[in-house]
A protein has these predicted regions:
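Conserved phosphotransfer cores of two-component systems
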Residues: 168
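Conserved N-terminal beta1-alpha1 strand-loop-helix module at the mouth
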Residues: 1-89, 95-103, 107-110, 114-115, ...
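Short gly/ser/thr-rich secondary-structure transition/capping motifs
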Residues: 118-122
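Short glycine-rich anion-binding loops that position phosphate/pyrophosphate groups of nucleotides
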Residues: 143-145
Length: 168
C-alpha cells in the first residue's frame, strides 16, 4: 500500500499572508497543497480561481492539487492546467454521461497533468469503478462539498474501504 499523502487546503488560510501560510505547510512536511475551487453554482460558496493559483505557483515546490467544485469543469481544465495545476480533480456529479467524464479525464491528461475524480457523500462509490484505470487520484468526500470546518461523515469509511479493495 502506498503511503498516505496529506494535502493541506488553502481554503482556511490567511490570504493576506498566503505565501507564508504555504511556506509553513511546506516547512511542516507537506508535499501537496490543495486548492478548493468553488463557483457558487455546483456548491453554494465561491472561493477563488486562477489568479490565486497563478500568483503562488512560483513561490513553493509543492504539488498543486486543484479540486474543481464547479459546474462546467471542462471549460476551465485548460486554464488551470496552464496556470500551474499538477493534479486536476473533477466531480462525477458534474457530468451527464460516462462518456463526458472519460473525455474530461483525457483532456486533463492531454496537458500532462494527473487526473482525479471526486464523489459527494451520497454518491455510490461503485459509480466510479469504471474510471479507475484512467485516474491517478480519487477523492471520496467525507463532508458535503462547499464548506470548510465540517464534521467528518463516518459513512464515508466503508466507501473508502470498498474503493481500496477495488483498486488492489
Amino acid at each position: 500500500m502506498k503511503p498516505m499523502i496529506v494535502a493541506p487546503s488553502i481554503l482556511s488560510a490567511d490570504f493576506a499572508h498566503l505565501d507564508l501560510e504555504i511556506k509553513a505547510a511546506e516547512n511542516g512536511g507537506a508535499e501537496f497543497i490543495h486548492f478548493d475551487v468553488m463557483d457558487g453554482h455546483f456548491v453554494d460558496n465561491i472561493s477563488f480561481g486562477l489568479p490565486v493559483l497563478k500568483s503562488i505557483h512560483d513561490i513553493h515546490k509543492l504539488v498543486n492539487d486543484v479540486h474543481l467544485m464547479i459546474t462546467d469543469p471542462v471549460k476551465y481544465i485548460p486554464c488551470f492546467a496552464k496556470a500551474g495545476a499538477d493534479i486536476i480533480t473533477i466531480h462525477y456529479e458534474c457530468f451527464a454521461s460516462d462518456e463526458e467524464i472519460f473525455k474530461a479525464i483525457d483532456l486533463i491528461h492531454s496537458f500532462k497533468k494527473k487526473a482525479g475524480l471526486a464523489i459527494k457523500p451520497k454518491t455510490p462509490v461503485e459509480s466510479i469503478y469504471k474510471f479507475l484505470p484512467s485516474l491517478q487520484i480519487v477523492l471520496v468526500m467525507s463532508v458535503e462539498p462547499g464548506h470548510g470546518a465540517q464534521e467528518f461523515m463516518v459513512d464515508s469509511l466503508p466507501k473508502i474501504l470498498a474503493l481500496r479493495q477495488q483498486i488492489d
